[in-house]
Amino acid sequence: MQEGKKLLDFRRREMVETLKRYGITNQRVLKAFLEVPRHLFFEVEAWDAAYNDGAYPVGFGQTISQPYTVAFMTSLLVERSPSGKVLEIGTGSGYQAAILDALGYSVFSVERIVALYERAQQRFSRLGLHIACRFGDGTLGWKDEAPFDGIVVTAGAPKAPESLLQQLAENGCMIIPVGGSDAQQMTVIKREEGEFKRELFERFVFVPLVGREGWDDTVF
């Protein structure tokens, strides 16, 4: 058991070194990736794959994103909204939410697939994480808890949902992959003096953001 833990700890350190080689330099982000055991967000039989440099299926057509993707999105957020309340759209395995929690954010997360929502809730409870999670349509956000200093969308959207834009606090930012079903461009939307300013970054491939203000689930 102890040898297994040592191996997983070693592989987590290796993962962080890989993130550095890929250009992730924010020390707060790297520290969070060292602190959060990624394998605990996988089923036990998949622990060997937890620190591989790739996405991994979690069921229901969803994935836990590649470590670099999570780190890249998190870095974009930390550099623009270093503290406060963050809304995550697409809880999935719960790993991204746990990274945000380790960074000291007050984290709220919405998941549209009930089985993933329940599984994430159980993980958060077991790990002692104080993350607010609800089942629902993520494209509509969490109006009762708005405004948010940051919004992180972990699925590809045809455009930024208007409901999410309106739930951004002044000087808050949204990190969202926007584009078609084949690939999406990572986009940062900053709210300044009531206007929304966009920055465009590299392209990624995400599962679709399904919901009233996203994709229709019958399309995929």
UniProtKB/Swiss-Prot annotation:
Per the record, the coiled-coil ranges are none
Residue positions of the active site:
S65
Q: Which reaction does it catalyse?
A: [protein]-L-isoaspartate + S-adenosyl-L-methionine = [protein]-L-isoaspartate alpha-methyl ester + S-adenosyl-L-homocysteine
User: Which terms are listed as keywords in the entry?
Assistant: Cytoplasm, Methyltransferase, S-adenosyl-L-methionine, Transferase
**GO MF entries:** protein-L-isoaspartate (D-aspartate) O-methyltransferase activity
Q: Name one GO biological process term.
A: protein modification process
| InterPro entries noted in UniProt | PCMT, SAM-dependent_MTases_sf
Judging by the UniProt lineage, the source's domain of life is: Bacteria
Localization per record: Cytoplasm
GO cellular component terms attached to this protein's record: cytoplasm
Any idea of its EC number?
2.1.1.77
**Which first-to-last residue range defines the signal peptide?**
none
Among HAMAP family, the record links this protein to: PIMT
Give the protein's biological function.
Answer: Catalyzes the methyl esterification of L-isoaspartyl residues in peptides and proteins that result from spontaneous decomposition of normal L-aspartyl and L-asparaginyl residues. It plays a role in the repair and/or degradation of damaged proteins.
Q: Which family does it belong to?
A: Belongs to the methyltransferase superfamily. L-isoaspartyl/D-aspartyl protein methyltransferase family.
Q: Which NCBIfam families match?
A: pimt, PRK00312.1
Q: What is this protein called?
A: Protein-L-isoaspartate O-methyltransferase
Species source reads Pelodictyon phaeoclathratiforme (strain DSM 5477 / BU-1)
